[in-house]
């Protein structure tokens, strides 16, 4: 018998029971496949939740989407009017699952596909229409305009042992594939069935009384804000684990920044407790929205309108499994409509709903309350954290002075305290340098970066280079790799990839960039390069911060980006050494010159 994840017994205990079609398919697979096949039911894959994923070691993967639709109903007709305006074509849905596995979820797959398009065939797709007649399938196939090479349409009558064996053979799922090696198999396995986290994998970290109070999970709605480095993400991670222990259910953790999910994953990994990783759904809001829309066959017709449509999920609200705990990081980047959508459709009644943020990092100019706090859908006071564990005292002073200089009439200013054991360990003087460049000179910046790295004897893993512009990051990365022969960790495409994919269209370039962000991790042992906004939430020991001419001047950012908050966010990523290169931006020159003179 095939191996089921979760077990068939536990599948029938889920809060949202399998549909009639799903149950029929699961029983068929149980009766007709041996134990070389693994069956994953509604696995959470970075927001995607395909009905069934079938995998066989050394062979490949098959995604099976189940539809219990009545083809005689309003959303379908033989006159080429298959679906309502809001209902998504199931072919689009299943192809979205497949494309996301290549483009987002499994890092190596995208580059394998780009180098060898044949790799795309290791994942095949099947749509099982439980209530469709043979005639319905035939009409559907003749009307649609899709390449059918990797999709099979079947109904209950064609779901036989003989025919399904033919499908497995056609899709190479019953024999050895030279492309689906052990490394790929293990990569898929980690996403489909995340492993157990043991107590020994965690770390012992001392918490302050306020932090100990805030990591306690309880069914309430709460807002937590704090200065840079005050442990907001640490609290979120420990509260997430405690929430899972309290409810015995899955926890949804939402971010704004694509790559921040990996930072939160690292923080949860530090918790000394035992849990399975599949109990934590960590994802950024936009990917979550798109994935849930796809999971319920909903069309996104206009991203600007649908993302703020507070009734978007109304037609499927009774199908959506609710989370007893939802934790949202970077809430200063959220629109109020997003928060309302999450609470309305995804939070269980009397559920735990906790928001974490810092209005000083409001780089997207979201609306604030009259008292200059972040606008949310939770009433009551904020829980505040004012001690920083990240920043050296001198870096904290720069952040404080920056607030006084640029945020005086915009926000309530922070009084940043340094946590006692942080100060105790900081008995050396951090390094600060400031350069003003009258023109863009990447060779000059590169040579100075290398000179400082050598002088301070810095390990590559402790170094981050951030800029307001992607192009600058690409150029510096190229110089580091070509002239220093060093590997790097990039949050965007390389210069070579940019030149290659620009010729092929921006879609492929965006796919590569998103793949880099989704698979960015902090400890590869190499120098990290990123734009400031993509590094938001992360931290680094030694930071080279590159400030360029006001972005609106050349139109590379839209006017919804606030440069003051962006630069402040960049500064507060730094834990110890800070080196700033300012290219032509007079706005910040006087401030940083004063800092350098007083250092």
Residue spans of the language-model regions?
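Intrinsically disordered, low-complexity Ser/Thr/Pro/Gly-rich regulatory segments
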Residues: 1-50, 54-199
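Intrinsically disordered, low-complexity regions enriched in Ser/Pro/Gly/Gln/His and often acidic
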Residues: 94, 165, 331, 375-376
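Hydrophobic "anchor" residues on beta-strands that sit immediately upstream
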Residues: 38, 61-63, 325-328, 354
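Short N-terminal secondary-structure initiator segments
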Residues: 1-36, 183, 312-319, 365, ...
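Short glycine-rich substrate-engagement loop in P-loop NTPases that contacts/grips substrate
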Residues: 295-314
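Conserved helicase motor core of SF1/SF2 NTP-dependent helicases
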Residues: 203-209, 213, 220-294, 312-313, ...
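Short amphipathic alpha-helical "recognition" segments used for binding
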Residues: 26, 69, 215, 540-543
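Acidic/glycine-enriched edge-of-secondary-structure segments
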Residues: 84-87, 92-103, 225, 296-301, ...
């Amino acid at each position: 018998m095939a191996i089921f994840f979760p077990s068939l017994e536990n599948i029938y205990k889920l809060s949202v029971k399998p549909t009639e079609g799903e149950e029929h398919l699961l029983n068929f697979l149980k009766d007709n496949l041996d134990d070389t096949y693994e069956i994953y039911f509604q696995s959470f894959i970075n927001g995607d939740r395909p009905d069934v994923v079938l995998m066989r070691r050394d062979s490949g993967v098959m995604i099976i989407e189940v539809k219990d639709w009545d083809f005689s109903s309003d959303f379908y007709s033989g006159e080429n009017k298959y679906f309502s305006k809001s209902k998504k074509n199931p072919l689009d849905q299943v192809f979205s699952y497949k494309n996301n596995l290549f483009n987002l979820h499994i890092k190596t797959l995208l580059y394998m596909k780009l180098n060898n398009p044949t790799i795309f065939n290791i994942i095949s797709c099947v749509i099982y229409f439980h209530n469709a007649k043979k005639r319905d399938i035939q009409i559907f196939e003749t009307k649609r305009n899709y390449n059918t090479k990797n999709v099979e349409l079947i109904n209950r009558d064609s779901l036989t042992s003989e025919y399904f064996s033919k499908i497995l053979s056609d899709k190479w799922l019953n024999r050895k594939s030279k492309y689906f090696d052990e490394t790929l198999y293990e990569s898929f396995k980690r996403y489909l069935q995340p492993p157990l986290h043991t107590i020994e994998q965690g770390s012992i970290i001392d918490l302050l009384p306020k932090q100990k109070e805030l990591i306690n999970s309880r069914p309430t709605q709460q807002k937590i804000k704090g200065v840079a480095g005050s442990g907001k993400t640490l609290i979120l991670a420990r509260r997430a684990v405690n929430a899972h222990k309290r409810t015995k259910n899955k926890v949804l953790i939402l971010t704004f920044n694509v790559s921040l999910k990996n930072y939160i994953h690292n923080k949860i990994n530090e918790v000394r407790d035992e849990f399975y990783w599949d109990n934590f759904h960590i994802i950024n809001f936009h990917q979550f929205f798109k994935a849930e829309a796809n999971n319920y066959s909903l069309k996104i017709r206009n991203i600007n309108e649908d993302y703020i449509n507070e009734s978007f999920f109304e037609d499927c609200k009774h199908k959506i499994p609710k989370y007893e705990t939802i934790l949202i990081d970077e809430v200063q980047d959220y629109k109020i409509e997003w928060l309302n959508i999450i609470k309305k459709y995804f939070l269980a009644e009397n559920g735990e709903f906790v928001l974490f943020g810092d209005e000083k990092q409001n780089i997207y100019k979201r609306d604030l309350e009259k008292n200059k706090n972040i606008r949310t859908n939770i009433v009551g006071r904020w829980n505040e954290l004012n001690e920083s564990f990240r920043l050296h005292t001198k870096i904290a002073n720069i952040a404080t002075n920056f607030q006084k200089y640029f945020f005086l009439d915009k926000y309530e200013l922070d009084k940043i305290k340094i946590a006692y054991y942080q100060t105790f360990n900081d008995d050396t003087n951090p390094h600060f340098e400031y350069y003003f460049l009258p023109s863009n000179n990447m060779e000059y910046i590169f040579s100075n970066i290398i000179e400082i790295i050598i002088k301070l004897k810095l390990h590559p893993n402790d170094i981050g280079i951030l800029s307001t512009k992607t192009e600058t990051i690409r150029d510096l990365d190229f110089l580091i790799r070509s002239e220093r022969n060093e590997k790097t960790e990039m949050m965007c495409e390389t210069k070579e990839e940019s030149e290659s994919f620009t010729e092929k269209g921006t879609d492929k370039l965006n796919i590569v960039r998103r793949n880099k962000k989704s698979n960015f991790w902090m400890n590869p042992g190499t120098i990290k390069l990123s734009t400031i906004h993509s590094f938001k939430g992360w931290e680094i020991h030694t930071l080279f911060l590159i400030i360029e001419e006001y972005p609106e001047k050349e139109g590379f950012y839209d006017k919804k980006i606030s440069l003051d908050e962006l630069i402040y966010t960049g500064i507060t990523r730094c834990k110890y050494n800070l080196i700033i290169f300012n290219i032509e931006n007079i706005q910040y020159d006087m401030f940083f010159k004063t800092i350098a003179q007083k250092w």
